C-alpha cells in the first residue's frame, strides 16, 4: 500500500478528509485534514496518535509527523473541493497560459460534470468566465475572507 493511500485510509476511517500530504527532504511528514465542522487541536491529536501507530506498524520511515488543518487558504485538489466551495473567492493557477495569463482570481462556480467555472474581472467592471478542468490546474486555493470589524 502506498503512503498516500495508507494515510488516506487511516484519516477517512477516523471521519476526516485528507486534504493534502507533503513529505519534506528532511523526513518530515505533513498531513492536512479537514471536516465540514472544522478542525480542532483534539482532532489533530487524535489523527496524530493513530497515524504514529499505523506508520510504526507499516515500518514507514519518517523523522517528524505534523497534522494540522489546511488553513484559511486551503488548497483545492479534488472535484468535490470545487463543489463544496462554490461561491467562494479563489485563486487558480493554470499549467498553461490562457489568454496570456496563468493566474486568475475570482468567484468559483459549481462544477458541471468535469468542467469548473471561475467568474473573474477581465478589465475594470468587465466580468468574464473561465472554464477549466482539474487537469488544467497547477494549483488552486481559497482566498481567506477575514473581517476585522468589531461585532456589536
From Swiss-Prot:
Report whether Cytoplasm shows up as a keyword of the record.
yes
Name the major location: cytoplasm
Q: Subcellular localization, per the record?
A: Cytoplasm
Stretch forming the signal peptide: none
UniProt cross-references to Gene3D superfamilies, sorted A to Z = Ribosome maturation factor RimP, C-terminal domain, RimP-like superfamily, N-terminal
Q: What is an annotated GO biological process for this record, any one?
A: translation
**InterPro entries per UniProt:** Ribosome_maturation_RimP, RimP_C, RimP_C_sf, RimP_N, RimP_N_sf
What SUPFAM superfamilies does this protein map onto?
YhbC-like, C-terminal domain, YhbC-like, N-terminal domain
> What would be one Pfam family of this protein?
RimP_N
What GO CC terms are in its UniProt record? cytosol
Q: Which PANTHER family match?
A: RIBOSOME MATURATION FACTOR RIMP (PTHR33867:SF1)
The record's function comment reads: Required for maturation of 30S ribosomal subunits.
> What is the similarity comment for this entry?
Belongs to the RimP family.
Please identify the protein, giving its name as recorded. Answer: Ribosome maturation factor RimP
From which source organism is this entry?
Burkholderia multivorans (strain ATCC 17616 / 249)
Which gene is transcribed and translated to give this protein? rimP
Amino acid at each position: 500500500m502506498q503512503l498516500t493511500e495508507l494515510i488516506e485510509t487511516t484519516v477517512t476511517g477516523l471521519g476526516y478528509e485528507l486534504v493534502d500530504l507533503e513529505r519534506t527532504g528532511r523526513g518530515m511528514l505533513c498531513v492536512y485534514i479537514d471536516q465540514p465542522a472544522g478542525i480542532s487541536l483534539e482532532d489533530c491529536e487524535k489523527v496524530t496518535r493513530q497515524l504514529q501507530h499505523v506508520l510504526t506498524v507499516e515500518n514507514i520511515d519518517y523523522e517528524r509527523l505534523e497534522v494540522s488543518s489546511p488553513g484559511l487558504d486551503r488548497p483545492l485538489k479534488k472535484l468535490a473541493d470545487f463543489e463544496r466551495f462554490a461561491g467562494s473567492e479563489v485563486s487558480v493557477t493554470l499549467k498553461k497560459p490562457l489568454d496570456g495569463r496563468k493566474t486568475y482570481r475570482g468567484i468559483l462556480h459549481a462544477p458541471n460534470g468535469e468542467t469548473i467555472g471561475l467568474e473573474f474581472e477581465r478589465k475594470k467592471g468587465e466580468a468574464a468566465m473561465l472554464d477549466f478542468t482539474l487537469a488544467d490546474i497547477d494549483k488552486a486555493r481559497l482566498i481567506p475572507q477575514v473581517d476585522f470589524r468589531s461585532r456589536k
